[in-house]
């Protein structure tokens, strides 16, 4: 599942995804971002004055979804909590990986995205339904189960 996620985030040279955070009023906020897979983890450089940085400082919960694929309908999603990274050696490794893709950043804050769950939807050739889902962790906690129908 991890390799499928990597391939979907890195469809082009730089990682691309949509980051969902929680605004101060509790509503959702969605941002395009450039995730970095490096140093055994998933990271984001975020501008210090960005609304998404403010959201993550206040409430670290996030969801991250890959950009749509031009050739297939496969999807990859992760969720968890973001934590600021102040370790200079970790930042150097992640920065080198990020800039090797041609991307650039300066004094942006580095966040590690600590994963609590992931979902990969694998589709057959277009048009096909339903996809084959792979989840991590495989068995959700009872209070986190996703309902597939709308309750009356």
Would you name each region that the model predicts?
Residues 14-48, 54-56, 62-68, 75-78:
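Short beta-strand segments
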Residues 72-152:
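Charged, gly/pro-rich active-site loop segments
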Residues 9-11, 56, 98, 113:
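A generic structural signal for nonpolar/aromatic side chains embedded in well-ordered alpha-helices
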Residues 6-7, 53, 95:
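Short amphipathic alpha-helical segments and helix-helix/interface helices
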Residues 1-16, 138-152:
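Extreme N-terminal tail/first-helix region
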Residues 15-16, 61, 103, 118:
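Generic structural signal for secondary-structure transition and capping sites
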């Amino acid at each position: 599942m991890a390799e499928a996620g990597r391939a979907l985030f890195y469809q082009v040279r730089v990682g691309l995804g949509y980051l969902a955070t929680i605004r101060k009023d509790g509503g959702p906020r969605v941002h395009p971002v450039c995730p970095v897979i490096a140093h055994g983890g998933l990271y984001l450089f975020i501008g210090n004055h960005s609304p998404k940085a403010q959201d993550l400082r206040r409430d670290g919960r996030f969801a991250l979804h890959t950009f749509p694929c031009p050739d297939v309908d496969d999807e990859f999603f992760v969720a968890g909590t973001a934590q600021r990274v102040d370790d200079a050696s970790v930042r150097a490794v992640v920065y080198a990986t990020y800039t090797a893709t041609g991307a650039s950043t300066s004094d942006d804050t580095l966040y590690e995205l600590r994963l609590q769950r992931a979902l990969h939807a694998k589709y057959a050739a277009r048009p096909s339904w339903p996809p084959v889902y792979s989840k991590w962790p495989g068995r959700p906690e009872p209070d986190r189960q996703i309902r597939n129908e709308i309750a009356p």
